[in-house]
Amino acid sequence: MKENISQNEPIVYLLQEVPGTKIGRPKYNIIGAQKFGRIEVLLREDTQIVRSPGPITYQLRRLLKDFTDKDYLLLSGDPKVIGLSIAVACDINNGKYKTLTWDKQEKMYYSTEFNIYERGEIDEQDKL
């Protein structure tokens, strides 16, 4: 049954629990991200990469093994965990991933799509 759910509904992968979750008082509310899909927490809030990224890399590969174009990363926690999670998602999904960003003014999440293999002229001027 779980396979049918994951095939049809996008998943919002919350990289680490919201700070304060462990003591029952999360610092912020992520309920608005449910608009984009079912929220799945990958790592505990106290997870850190101190010396060796090996064990967490293995854990993230296992947890993100079904990551697809329709899924999202909700970036939270240790910057090294964020970087590693993006690298793993890119490796699994041919360089493509989407993130959710909270807009403080509009009080809502926005999606941003990335493709690290997107090609353009290297010397091309920024059009931003």
What do the PLM-derived regions correspond to, one by one?
Residues 75:
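Short, surface-exposed polybasic-aromatic patches that bind anionic ligands, especially phosphate groups
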Residues 1-72, 84-128:
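Long, low-complexity, Lys/Arg-enriched
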Residues 79-81:
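Short beta->alpha connector loops
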